[in-house]
Amino acid sequence: DTSTIRVGGRGAHLARPAEPTGAGMLLLPMITGIGQRVREFAAELAESGVTTLSWDPFHGVSMDDHELDTMVELMHGLDDETCLAEMQRLLDHMFGELGLEKVGVIGYCLGGRFALLLGARDERLANVVAYHPTVPATPADNHTVDPFEETPRIAAPVMMLYPGQDTIVPHEVFAKLQDGLQ
């Protein structure tokens, strides 16, 4: 069962399992927004019994109907603190209105960076999964929260994966994030 819901005045994609387990994941997408692939990820998690709520960073815009250039421009307009506040409202909704007992966060690329930041900010999280978090060597102008300072504060178990052929995030950055987790 999937639907678009409103939380705090913003849209989010909800995928519910046929047989709920009380577990949930907040899914933070890559630059694609809540496109087809993200909806598929959410459905796969729901099929395993995990209620999945996907944050919509671009408020309805996705690569389903927009070019990469548009998505890059929108990504550069994201404000870290505003995004983190939106994610915390989604977590509140998951624990409150959805009645979930355990919630983790999983993010890809853009969402991987935010998964680490949110993990440092919200102790309610059961786990943090960050697939190839986009943390450039030189922070983007709109990156006002430093993941190197925040990552050591994560209390939940963390799984972070780095793609071997990444051309955006140097291996040294990944190693520094990894050191912060140790």
Language-model regions: role of each:
Residues 1-182:
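N-terminal cap/leader regions of alpha/beta-hydrolase-fold enzymes
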